[in-house]
Design a protein with these regions (language model features):
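N-terminal secretory signal peptides that target proteins for export/translocation
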Residues: 1-15
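Serine/proline-rich low-complexity intrinsically disordered segments, especially terminal tails, linkers
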Residues: 17, 31-35, 155
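Bacterial N-terminal signal peptides
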Residues: 20-31
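N-terminal soluble domains immediately following signal/targeting peptides that reside
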Residues: 36-179
Length: 179
């Protein structure tokens, strides 16, 4: 950037706002790329798979956040990308912190299928029998919120008539699924 700026002549009276803007953009890009894992957000998708006749629940977290949470909450440290025990521990952690209930308050209990790391993301998979899909009335998801109170867990419930998005913050207990 400095070489580019040195080679340009500035017209008399012209400001250096353009150069300042470029430098600000460069610094912003660097700061975003170095702290991307600190977004403290997770995404969960719940949808019915008619072929398998299962409700598929897929949670996406930043792998670095998962490692940090395991170290802080459970005292378990290591590389989640190479240690299957850490991956399994985080899957169990998410399963404990995610809940579904029906309109009467009865728990629907998703089965933990597994977890995997792909790139920067850690994926946790759960499933329910298809018959439970229409019964989902409330969703709870407070994963990582005891580590980061500002953690936002977004849940997309995909149905035939569209997607319902719930955003759980501040250790929301259970949020009602909108009609």
């Amino acid at each position: 950037v400095a070489a580019w700026c040195a080679g340009r002549r500035r017209a008399p009276g012209r400001s250096t706002t353009r150069v300042g803007g470029l430098l600000a953009l460069l610094l912003l890009t660097l700061s975003v790329s170095t702290s991307a894992h600190q977004l403290q957000a997770a995404l969960t998708t719940i949808e019915l798979n008619p072929r398998s006749e299962l409700v598929e629940i897929v949670h996406r977290f930043y792998a670095h956040d998962a490692e940090h949470a395991l170290a802080e909450v459970a005292g378990i440290e290591g590389d989640i990308r190479t240690d299957p025990a850490l991956l399994e521990a985080f899957g169990r952690y998410v399963a404990r912190h995610f809940s579904l209930t029906d309109a009467e308050g009865n728990a629907l209990e998703p089965e933990l299928v597994g977890a995997e790391v792909e790139g920067d993301f850690l994926w946790v998979y759960q499933q329910l029998p298809a018959g439970d899909f229409g019964r989902i009335a409330r969703i709870g998801h407070d994963s990582l919120q005891e580590v980061w109170p500002q953690q936002e867990n977004r849940v997309n419930l995909r149905r035939d008539d569209g997607v319902r998005t719930l955003i759980l913050r501040n250790r929301d207990n259970r949020v009602a699924v909108p009609d």
